[in-house]
Amino acid sequence: MEKELIVTDVVVIGAGPAGMTAALYASRANLKTHMIEKGVPGGEVNNTADVENYPGFSLVSGPELAQHMYQGAMRFDAVHDYGDVSHIEVAGDLKRVHTSSKVYEAKAVIVATGSFHRHLGVPGEEELAGRGVSYCAVCDGFFFRDKEIIVVGGGDSAVEEAHYLTQFASKVTVIHRRDELRAQKVLQDRAFANPKIEFIWDSVVEEILGTDAVEGVQIKNVKTGQTSRVDAQGVFIYVGLVPNSEAVKDLGITDQEGWIITDDHMATSLPGVFAAGDVRQKHLRQIVTATGDGGTAGFQAYQYIETLKD
């Protein structure tokens, strides 16, 4: 089947905070802008219960913030298309972005595809996904009312979601491979003060146990080598992120782990190809840093296209 051809100025891939802000800035610069997203606009923001560190809001739910961003992104006539980008071709000044049914020809491309939660890679994880194993407390927490839950990880996401889950669970046990948390102090203090949260230190999950549903986990102490079982009906996993950069893997713009390498202007080594948000090689991945990236990328795409007129 021949694909539909769409000619545009800028293609933004992804509709998370970075992508929506990039679309806002590009379309506001009077560029014909198409924003492609395979899921619900907002990305991981939709999976966040409460956002308390985004300027302009003392407290806002993730989905509500995403809706505000989407309205802004569409304000200057950007086009929102649903689709899953398979690959990108770069031929000089022309870029071709492919989905299953369309080909977009653009002068500039902004990759804002974000990241997803890393899996543990242990027995039982894939088999029990959706049957007690989860990566989204906001999505699935309600199903564990009055049950015991394990949260794996020690960073911001793990600690924040552990606290969130206590409104449903009878007990939340945080299992962390180190002897101290990596989360921000305000999140640590909140977790340590919560009587429903317990901690198991210096331990890793070796297996998720259960036949038809999660029944617990087998853990190993990394210092002593001792193994033990912890009973629970749910396991929520927050052990880092993986870049969602499959569509650009052949372009030579990523590091060995798949994060896209850019300069401070969000430009990659390919002229006219930019990246923004969590898919970038960067230190801090937050909503506010993603929107900053997106604004910069949208503006720099405009600047780049202006140079093509010379």
Model-derived regions: residue spans:
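Beta1-alpha1 glycine-rich phosphate/pyrophosphate-binding loop at the start
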Residues: 2-76, 147, 159-185, 200
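Residue-level detector of alpha-helix initiation sites
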Residues: 16-17, 40, 115-117, 156-157, ...
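FAD-site-proximal beta/loop scaffold in flavoenzymes
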Residues: 5, 116, 121, 126-143, ...
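Glycine/small-residue-rich loop that forms an oxyanion/phosphate-binding "nest" at active or ligand-binding sites
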Residues: 80-142
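A Rossmann-like FAD-binding core segment of flavoenzymes
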Residues: 6, 73-98, 103-106, 167-264, ...
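Glycine/Thr-rich phosphate-binding loops of Rossmann-like dinucleotide-binding domains
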Residues: 44, 106, 119-120, 159-160, ...
